[in-house]
Amino acid sequence: MFSCFKFISTPSLVKSTSQLLSRPLSAVVLKRPEILTDESLSSLAVSRPLTSLVSSRNFQTSAISRDIDTAAKFIGAGAATVGVAGSGAGIGTVFGSLIIGYARNPSLKQQLFSYAILGFALSEAMGLFCLMVAFLILFAM
């Protein structure tokens, strides 16, 4: 079968078919390939480099898709900002527990205070991390 194909196909058909197969499927469907002769192929090879033969594909975004992207950014940033409110609630819980613990056993004042500072630091770090993620979503994406 391969020997029959060698006799049927011409060099220009093989070259135009190979160019057709190297293009993306969307470009093949949307645009029909040009029939190239040996003279036009040789003039293309001499006059322009191979990189200029590749068609540039520009992505176009509509106003609706840009609005959807913007809305998704705001929703994601709002969800990340909820963590900052959780951090505030955590800090309140830590110091509320410090007051209750000190009222129950005043002799553990130093140990309770060190645990409260540790809880405050961890809660504040999580709040700052959530705020950083919210800003990254808004301004870096």
UniProtKB/Swiss-Prot annotation:
Primary location: mitochondrion
Record flagged with keyword Lipid metabolism: no
GO cellular component: mitochondrial membrane; proton-transporting ATP synthase complex; proton-transporting two-sector ATPase complex, proton-transporting domain
Membrane topology: Multi-pass membrane protein
Post-translational modification: Trimethylated by ATPSCKMT at Lys-109. Methylation is required for proper incorporation of the C subunit into the ATP synthase complex and mitochondrial respiration.
Top-level taxon of the source organism: Eukaryota
First and last residues of the transit peptide: 1-66
InterPro entries, sorted: ATP_synth_F0_csu, ATP_synth_F0_csu_DDCD_BS, ATP_synth_F0_csu_sf, ATPase_proteolipid_c-like_dom, F/V-ATP_Csub_sf
SUPFAM superfamilies: F1F0 ATP synthase subunit C
Pfam families documented for this protein: ATP-synt_C
Residues with N6,N6,N6-trimethyllysine modification: 109
Localisation per UniProt entry: Mitochondrion membrane
Record bears the keyword Transport: yes
GO-annotated biological processes: proton motive force-driven ATP synthesis
Site (Reversibly protonated during proton transport): 124
Single Gene Ontology MF annotation: lipid binding
CDD domains: ATP-synt_Fo_c_ATP5G3
Keywords noted in UniProt: CF(0), Hydrogen ion transport, Ion transport, Lipid-binding, Membrane, Methylation, Mitochondrion, Transit peptide, Transmembrane, Transmembrane helix, Transport
Residues annotated as transmembrane: 82-102, 117-137
Disease: This protein is the major protein stored in the storage bodies of animals or humans affected with ceroid lipofuscinosis (Batten disease).
The protein's role, per its UniProt record: Mitochondrial membrane ATP synthase (F(1)F(0) ATP synthase or Complex V) produces ATP from ADP in the presence of a proton gradient across the membrane which is generated by electron transport complexes of the respiratory chain. F-type ATPases consist of two structural domains, F(1) - containing the extramembraneous catalytic core and F(0) - containing the membrane proton channel, linked together by a central stalk and a peripheral stalk. During catalysis, ATP synthesis in the catalytic domain of F(1) is coupled via a rotary mechanism of the central stalk subunits to proton translocation.
Family recorded in the similarity comment: Belongs to the ATPase C chain family.
Subunit structure: F-type ATPases have 2 components, CF(1) - the catalytic core - and CF(0) - the membrane proton channel. CF(1) has five subunits: alpha(3), beta(3), gamma(1), delta(1), epsilon(1). CF(0) has three main subunits: a, b and c. Interacts with DNAJC30; interaction is direct.
Something else known: There are three genes which encode the mitochondrial ATP synthase proteolipid and they specify precursors with different import sequences but identical mature proteins.
Protein name per the record: ATP synthase F(0) complex subunit C2, mitochondrial
Gene name in the database record: ATP5MC2
